[in-house]
């Protein structure tokens, strides 16, 4: 028989839903939307870093950072 500890009793509710899966697609479409938005964010950051997007009056030179 497994040893019962106070920490185990506290953490037991967190493991109560183990193995249960929501039927159907669940929240997959929401995750897809957020992944798409994150991809757009990364592309914008990459284009700013690569100077593909020209920002008016913003100098993207490492010398000016110092």
UniProtKB/Swiss-Prot annotation:
Keyword field contains Thylakoid: yes
UniProt keyword terms in alphabetical order: Chloroplast, Membrane, Photosynthesis, Photosystem II, Plastid, Thylakoid, Transmembrane, Transmembrane helix
Keyword hit for S-adenosyl-L-methionine: no
InterPro entries: PSII_PsbH, PSII_PsbH_sf
Subcellular location: Plastid, Chloroplast thylakoid membrane
Stored Pfam families: PsbH
Bilayer topology: Single-pass membrane protein
Domain of life of the native organism: Eukaryota
BP-aspect Gene Ontology terms: photosynthesis; protein stabilization
Single GO MF descriptor: phosphate ion binding
Chief location of this protein within or outside the cell: plastid
Residue ranges of the TM segments: 29-49
GO cellular component terms, A-Z: chloroplast thylakoid membrane; photosystem II
Function: One of the components of the core complex of photosystem II (PSII), required for its stability and/or assembly. PSII is a light-driven water:plastoquinone oxidoreductase that uses light energy to abstract electrons from H(2)O, generating O(2) and a proton gradient subsequently used for ATP formation. It consists of a core antenna complex that captures photons, and an electron transfer chain that converts photonic excitation into a charge separation.
Quaternary data: PSII is composed of 1 copy each of membrane proteins PsbA, PsbB, PsbC, PsbD, PsbE, PsbF, PsbH, PsbI, PsbJ, PsbK, PsbL, PsbM, PsbT, PsbX, PsbY, PsbZ, Psb30/Ycf12, at least 3 peripheral proteins of the oxygen-evolving complex and a large number of cofactors. It forms dimeric complexes.
Family matches, as PANTHER family: PHOTOSYSTEM II REACTION CENTER PROTEIN H
Sequence similarity: Belongs to the PsbH family.
Name of protein: Photosystem II reaction center protein H
Gene source species: Emiliania huxleyi (Coccolithophore)
């Amino acid at each position: 028989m497994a040893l019962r500890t106070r920490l185990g009793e506290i953490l037991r509710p967190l493991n109560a839903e183990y193995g249960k899966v929501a039927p159907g697609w669940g929240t997959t479409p929401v995750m897809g939307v957020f992944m798409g938005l994150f991809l757009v964010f990364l592309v914008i950051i990459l284009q700013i870093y690569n100077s593909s997007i020209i920002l008016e009056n913003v100098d993207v030179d490492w010398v000016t950072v110092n």
